Amino acid sequence: MCGIWALFGSDDCLSVQCLSAMKIAHRGPDAFRFENVNGYTNCCFGFHRLAVVDPLFGMQPIRVKKYPYLWLCYNGEIYNHKKMQQHFEFEYQTKVDGEIILHLYDKGGIEQTICMLDGVFAFVLLDTATKKVFLGRDTYGVRPLFKAMTEDGFLAVCSEAKGLVTLKHSTTPFLKVEPFLPGHYEVLDLKPNGKVASVEMVKYHHCRDEPLHALYDNVEKLFPGFEIETVKNNLRILFNNAVKKRLMTDRRIGCLLSGGLDSSLVAATLLKQLKEARVQYPLQTFAIGMEDSPDLLAARKVADHIGSEHYEVLFNSEEGIQALDEVIFSLETYDITTVRASVGMYLISKYIRKNTDSVVIFSGEGSDELTQGYIYFHKAPSPEKAEEESERLLRELYLFDVLRADRTTAAHGLELRVPFLDHRFSSYYLSLPPEMRIPKNGIEKHLLRETFEDSNLIPKEILWRPKEAFSDGITSVKNSWFKILQEYVEHQVDDAMMANAAQKFPFNTPKTKEGYYYRQVFERHYPGRADWLSHYWMPKWINATDPSARTLTHYKSAVKA
């Protein structure tokens, strides 16, 4: 996890502009570099480094002697870089995984390069020989990327929007900043004056398509067919491999553990893989919650079962409420469910950074979207409609759960790794018949649970534990986190303010006092940037007025049972 920043065609003093780059310093606390592009006085790169791989030679922009015309600034991890290096017999100058991007690009161009990358990434690649600039982002947008571009060709790129909003440009006082779409790359012409012109924007990968790099994977051969035992065996193979490849780091590994199905499977598989790799330190797992939190109890059971070095972080409602301003600033969104769920993740990340030496943190993000884990999937009118909704959620991850996971950890200089969003695992899961993936017998994620039923990987009661949203599970059923927040904002937002909400906030007008409060905080930090969120996250098919799972009939029935 790092922070990248780049300008092309700036008409303001670069020494002034680069102050904006310092707004993402939290993403890379280990080192910083600011470098002008040779021959272009108005083009530059900025890089904040979190040293995870090759601490000695990992600074950016990456430049190697063989390709003096290439400049690369990227944030991410390329898990198959050694496999690609060996297969194509590339001569490396460093041990940095991102160097593979330069070699692949020189060999086959940008399309082949980006399709061959197995990992998570956001990059800016400059080729001064062909006068081209390339931007690219991974399939699910696990690594963030924002851009601002004016009609006269000024381009600014950054890992977080906050690094762009204060930039100056003579022709455009208010720069339009927008997220770069996941699963896309863009080609731009670089003009002699340092400005750029967009040539094409290409969607290079659909989430259900098997990635091109699968041809070179080390995964053992999968069995053909959709018989249930065959499918379960293939899923175990792919999930184990998804975790194993993510062990690539020179820093200590930890794992978030809520006690839910997803984080428990990740933690248990991770500990198993660390033992097989003969890592010399125990796995640290981390859970957060208030008193009487069901997550804390469940996480404790899992930690005892797998034998991890477990940490429990307690917080109270006052601490959670006090963190809201920092959380919304870090997130760059005002989405209600995202803000709710981010408070606990922000506080536990803060604890990890301050009290432990774990830096690379595993988590279960992406599973609910992939495996139809949200409770409202019980109400899907058909398997096909459930499949459509699952793919929509995956396409929008970069606006919600992936955004939350990245910003709350990056705010404290941690790197998050999410095995459920592995290309091979997710594309195989999406290739299964729709009727295999829907909830069964009143239980969501039935196929995933069934896959690991006989493995003794995690306790049976956890394997079949009903879905509990992270923002709900950190508090007791009697006093849910969303209720605590709603009680607080009741005294911060009055009825007169709500009556004027549509006039004050015509776009994405908040419908509740909680939404109004978050929007106020957001506008204070990012005035006029409400369009970063296209819509609020909300369950389908059930006429929900609140995103919390605890407001749904299915959840209430499960609790009573």
Swiss-Prot record:
Keyword Phosphoprotein: yes
Pfam families, per the entry: Asn_synthase, GATase_7
Residues that bear Phosphothreonine: 545
Residues of the Asparagine synthetase domain: 213-536
Binding residue positions for ATP: 256, 288, 363-364
InterPro entries in the cross-refs: Asn_synth_AEB (IPR006426), Asn_synthase (IPR001962), Asn_Synthetase (IPR050795), AsnB_N (IPR033738), GATase_2_dom (IPR017932), Ntn_hydrolases_N (IPR029055), Rossmann-like_a/b/a_fold (IPR014729)
Residues holding L-glutamine: 49-53, 75-77, 97
Positions of the catalytic residues: 2
Modified residues (Phosphoserine): 557
The entry's keywords: Acetylation, Amino-acid biosynthesis, Asparagine biosynthesis, ATP-binding, Glutamine amidotransferase, Ligase, Nucleotide-binding, Phosphoprotein
Known catalytic reactions: L-aspartate + L-glutamine + ATP + H2O = L-asparagine + L-glutamate + AMP + diphosphate + H(+)
Pathway the protein takes part in: Amino-acid biosynthesis; L-asparagine biosynthesis; L-asparagine from L-aspartate (L-Gln route): step 1/1
Source taxon at top rank: Eukaryota
GO molecular function (one): asparagine synthase (glutamine-hydrolyzing) activity
GO BP: L-asparagine biosynthetic process
Domain Glutamine amidotransferase type-2 residues, every copy: 2-191
EC number, as in UniProt: 6.3.5.4
Modified residues (N6-acetyllysine): 385
Record site feature (Important for beta-aspartyl-AMP intermediate formation), residues: 365
Name of the protein in question: Asparagine synthetase [glutamine-hydrolyzing]
Protein source organism: Pongo abelii
